[in-house]
């Protein structure tokens, strides 16, 4: 999911009451909820599509989910001590507990892979023990309805807190409604996939992909072996992948290797100049295809 969604989840957990457990609880929750995306630093040393084979992997696996919150808790604890030594520590800040900082950073961090799993992009939940991709196919990467729900609830909770009202309840309601919304989206995906009985390119692979905005609909991708159809009426150009020597190409080109490692529904698009372009049917929309090919 996008980082705004991750941040709002962390903020709502804090507004639900956990921010009173220790000083700097909100930074621990919000930064922790985004912490696995530290792998975005790979853009500094990887080229082209190589980042596709790196992201949502090692920093989203079990060891990182334990160690990254430990680093964050240590930094926040050290920051509090540094401010205290300089006489700059805010008077209204609660006493800082390292144990609670770590627990909250860990909780925030754990929400990250849970949310990332929900979309078609995928996540390698078990790195470095396994490089298997997992897909929830439940939400689009950016869900405007979750933004509106969680954004309003966060604002309303903070507003109530300033006025001395019950500020925890809006966060409780938002988290509950958000969970019910996600469960409903999962049911829509399941029903859409079960409704597929045939396709011009076969049904070896069936993906019900949530589109942006219209979360009640699904783009149905069907096919296999490099031949795919979208919504039963759009068949993508391609050739059977078992006729291609992909192993040789992967060995010769690290970008092709990374792309095919990440791709779930890869297909080959012949170009006018005679070259071949690899794409993924999940991101075949012209607005996104250039970033995933």
Tell where the protein language model's regions lie, with residue ranges:
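N-terminal membrane-targeting hydrophobic helices
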Residues: 1-210
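Extracytosolic and intramembrane catalytic regions of membrane-associated proteins
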Residues: 202-205, 210-293
């Amino acid at each position: 999911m996008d980082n705004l969604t991750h941040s709002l989840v962390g903020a709502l957990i804090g507004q639900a009451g956990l921010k009173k457990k220790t000083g700097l609880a909100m930074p621990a929750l919000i930064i922790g909820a985004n912490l696995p995306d530290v792998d975005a630093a790979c853009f500094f040393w990887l080229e082209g599509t190589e980042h596709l084979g790196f992201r949502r992997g090692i920093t989203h696996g079990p060891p990182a989910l334990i160690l990254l919150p430990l680093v964050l808790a240590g930094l926040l604890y050290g920051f509090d001590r540094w401010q205290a030594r300089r006489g700059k520590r805010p008077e209204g800040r609660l006493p800082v507990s390292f144990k609670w900082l770590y627990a909250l950073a860990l909780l925030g961090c754990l929400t990250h892979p849970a949310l990332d799993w929900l979309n078609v992009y995928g996540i390698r939940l078990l790195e470095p023990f396994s490089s298997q991709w997992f897909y929830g196919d439940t939400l689009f990467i950016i869900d405007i309805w979750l933004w509106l729900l969680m954004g309003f609830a966060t604002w309303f909770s903070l507003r109530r807190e300033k006025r001395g009202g019950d500020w925890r309840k809006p966060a409780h309601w938002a988290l509950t409604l958000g969970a019910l919304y996600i469960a409903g989206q999962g049911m829509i995906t399941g029903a859409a996939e079960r409704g597929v009985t045939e396709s011009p390119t076969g049904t070896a692979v069936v993906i019900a992909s949530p589109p942006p905005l219209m979360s009640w609909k699904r783009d149905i991708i069907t096919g296999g072996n490099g031949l795919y159809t979208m919504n039963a009426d759009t068949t993508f150009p391609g050739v059977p992948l078992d006729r291609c020597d992909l192993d040789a190409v992967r060995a010769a080109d690290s970008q092709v290797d990374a792309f095919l490692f990440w791709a779930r529904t890869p297909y080959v698009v012949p170009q006018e100049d005679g070259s071949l372009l690899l794409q993924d049917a999940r991101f075949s929309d012209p607005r996104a295809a250039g970033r995933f090919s």
